[in-house]
């Protein structure tokens, strides 16, 4: 039983949703964006500020549709038709870090000479300020105010010809907090969860 004199922040006692973000991934399935769309419907209660889907097709082309609002406000038959491919990641946003705005709506899509990839994140990185300072010192330029973008910069900061999975593991070892990440490349879908089991 919770009472108003419990040691909980006041916002726990209002009627608003208190869950934060949701990620959904599909790999190797025909019409992946359709499944991702229905996955977002199932996760809609976890975030209502914005949502997005990134899909990759057989030609290694990444397509993205994202926007601010509910799933049914952002997606329609016409824009879902543009998301062709057999792999996709999707995200619903409830901001815990960074402000509002379309630049913070995920999944993020990153273009790089070693290969493009998309990233979706649920959670909160408690060492985000330190990581942002470190990455800025190394020359990173950020496109959002979301802590989620940090992982992409960490993955690409010291490529040194290593396989992407090694870069991902190295990057994950640098972050602290609660998280679930989906990273979609043209060949693989990587999933990572914090050691506490968010």
Q: Which sequence ranges carry the predicted segments?
A:
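Conserved short alpha-helical segments that host acidic/polar catalytic motifs at enzyme active sites
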Residues: 2-198
């Amino acid at each position: 039983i919770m009472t108003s004199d419990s040691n909980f922040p006041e916002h726990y006692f209002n009627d608003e949703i208190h869950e934060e973000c949701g990620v959904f991934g599909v790999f190797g399935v025909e019409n992946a964006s359709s499944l991702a769309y229905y996955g977002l419907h199932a996760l809609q209660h976890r975030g209502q500020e914005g949502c997005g889907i990134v899909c990759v097709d057989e030609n290694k082309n990444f397509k993205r549709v994202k926007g601010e609002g509910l799933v049914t406000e952002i997606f329609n038959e016409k824009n879902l038709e543009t998301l062709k491919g057999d792999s996709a990641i999707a995200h619903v946003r409830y901001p815990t870090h960074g402000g509002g705005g379309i630049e913070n709506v995920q999944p993020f899509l990153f273009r790089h000479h070693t290969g493009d990839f998309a990233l979706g994140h649920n959670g909160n990185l408690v060492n985000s300020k330190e990581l942002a300072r470190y990455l800025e010192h190394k020359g990173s330029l950020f496109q959002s105010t979301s802590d989620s973008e940090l992982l992409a910069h960490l993955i690409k900061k010291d490529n040194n010809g290593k396989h992407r999975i090694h870069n991902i593991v190295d990057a994950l070892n640098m972050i602290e907090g609660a998280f679930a990440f989906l990273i979609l490349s043209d060949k693989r879908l990587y999933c990572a969860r914090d050691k506490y089991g968010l």
